[in-house]
């Protein structure tokens, strides 16, 4: 009797189901009111709906009630929404009621349906309080965690699937979810309260950081070894403490290791640091102040600038150093008391210094002419590294060898051996003490192979007819010098870092004993011979980690003339330039 009524109602229901307005138009119109990081939730329906949508749901509710009244098996895909009395928003039934006709096994076993699991608190209008992250887990794909940039979708954006289930349809403009072909389980994970979204972690960036940390760790280990080892050169120079210079150093722009023409000297060159070089006490104090976190006063900055400018020009600082520093420091009442004490020590040393010694220092600092400066600049400039610039004493000095004389570079064996031969030639011509100099490779050969390994090194030379014998010592990354004075029967070890060389002196003394037996058929009276290491206060000390080779050469220069060693660290830039010119012209200034 009522079959015609059922057919009419079914026709109306199908018509209403097809006339649902499109969801994209609503999304484009409501995009400004959407939350950026809200997720696709099939159970959430926005509070405001178009009037046509409300009319359709009212028709559906009426049909649902009519079907229930007559007892016909009429099923809807969604249950009627209940309007909240407090804020007018619509709340839907729990997700478990949406899939009321499906079992849990069927839900998890299907390869095309998603399981929406929600964590975290929700506000009364059905929107999560915290931002969510979409987690996609597939059987054949690794787990991926991607932030959800989708907008909140309306219920019309969900397509009806067989069996009364709904499948969420993502927004192609905003969703970043990769859809695998295999089964996927989507989880909605709420972040902790108050933390918000974190910056995505980049695997490549992590690898770069690990690589930089590894380089930095190796550099620190090397510097630590050079600072505490017995046979290496401690680095005491002041580097820029800013983070920018540290990163430049870790990126291998500030440090480099080279090998020049197969020689054994490692070129570990700091290329980008600047050092204000003054006398020992003042410079050591400035080093302490740089390491501290306190501020440097303006007067100290002015003094440092003045010292740096004059050291670059190669002027002498000792005669008026105390007056300049004391005058500058008295300008400010807040000067450091420790700095005053250091300056007073310098003043005392300057007063005790004789006029002749000051004259000697002045004679050492001969200014270079413009032509000499140009020639030096050309040699240190760009050009083929294997270009031979000077050849003598069976040695060839290339442009690469000369460029080790740049500021803050380490000298190699070729440069040191060439300069030592220039000292021998100078002593022969100018009537200085008879001098013999061993090669830088002599001591390593003697230490490793004994006397028989170097027996022929003195063929045609009688060492005991000489007055002074110089032996350059290379200890891994540090240069030093041993002076054998046959007139006084003593051996002296000179190290610009204050290290001791008793073992080195003993090896060389034993070599003299073997040489005396071979050449003179007589033993040395070892009781008459003495050896000791020069203490730091007895000879000038380097204030950086790159001038050990220069100090070794200048030790040899002064000692070969029986001249007191009076040079200082701040003269090294000028000495380097002079040495370039001397090697090019094969003549000492």
UniProtKB/Swiss-Prot annotation:
Positions of modified residues (Phosphoserine): 32, 333, 344
MF-aspect GO terms: deSUMOylase activity; SUMO-specific endopeptidase activity
UniProt PTM: Polyubiquitinated; which leads to proteasomal degradation.
EC number(s) reported in the record: 3.4.22.-
Annotated GO biological process: fat cell differentiation; heart development; labyrinthine layer development; mRNA transport; negative regulation of protein ubiquitination; positive regulation of protein ubiquitination; positive regulation of transcription by RNA polymerase II; protein destabilization
Listed GO CC annotations: cytosol; nuclear membrane; nuclear pore; nucleoplasm; nucleus; PML body
Keywords on record: Cytoplasm, Hydrolase, Membrane, mRNA transport, Nuclear pore complex, Nucleus, Phosphoprotein, Protease, Protein transport, Thiol protease, Translocation, Transport, Ubl conjugation, Ubl conjugation pathway, Wnt signaling pathway
Membrane topology of this protein: Peripheral membrane protein
Subcellular location: Nucleus, Nuclear pore complex; Nucleus membrane; Cytoplasm
Region (Disordered): 155-176
Effect ascribed to mutating residue 548 to S: Does not desumoylate CEBPB
Motif placement: Nuclear export signal: 317-332
Active site: residue positions: 478, 495, 548
Domain of life where this protein originates: Eukaryota
Motif (Nuclear localization signal): 28-31, 46-51
Gene3D superfamilies: Adenoviral Proteinase, Chain A
Region Protease, annotated ranges: 396-560
PANTHER family in UniProt: SENTRIN-SPECIFIC PROTEASE 2, SENTRIN/SUMO-SPECIFIC PROTEASE
Domain notes: The N-terminus is necessary and sufficient for nuclear envelope targeting.
Sequence similarity: Belongs to the peptidase C48 family.
Subunit record text: Binds to SUMO2 and SUMO3. Interacts with the C-terminal domain of NUP153 via its N-terminus. Interacts with MTA1.
Its job: Protease that catalyzes two essential functions in the SUMO pathway. The first is the hydrolysis of an alpha-linked peptide bond at the C-terminal end of the small ubiquitin-like modifier (SUMO) propeptides, SUMO1, SUMO2 and SUMO3 leading to the mature form of the proteins. The second is the deconjugation of SUMO1, SUMO2 and SUMO3 from targeted proteins, by cleaving an epsilon-linked peptide bond between the C-terminal glycine of the mature SUMO and the lysine epsilon-amino group of the target protein. May down-regulate CTNNB1 levels and thereby modulate the Wnt pathway.
Protein name: Sentrin-specific protease 2
Organism the protein comes from: Homo sapiens (Human)
